[in-house]
Amino acid sequence: MAKTNIKPIMPSLREKKRYLAFEAITNSQIDFKKAKEDISNAFIDLHGTLGTSKIAPMFLENKWNNASKTGIIKIGHKHVDDMKAAFAIAGSDKIIYKSLGVSGILKKAESKFIKKSG
């Protein structure tokens, strides 16, 4: 049987991505795993498992800054408001998650919203 190659999706048909910068406001130290778990659980509570799988948020671990407790999430452009809504119910009494801003370019989101330590 002949092997057929699947054509890649044209750029105009691909989902456009956005980079959402966020901050964890807390007095104690928080790591990437805890922040990802809190936000993911809130997102699942809000949109369900099926909604979360369709939206497919991607947490960028290498963009997490422990000193400023800030990070970046890659998400589709249609679902930015859904992610911001999940921030409202994420965390606990001692942790608040806040959206810092949205950008279409990762480098710009990092330079504009993520504070560098040192």
What do these predicted regions represent?
Residues E23-K63, L106-A109, F113-S117:
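Surface-exposed, low-hydrophobicity interaction/linker segments
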Residues K74-D81:
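Helix N-cap motif at beta-to-alpha junctions
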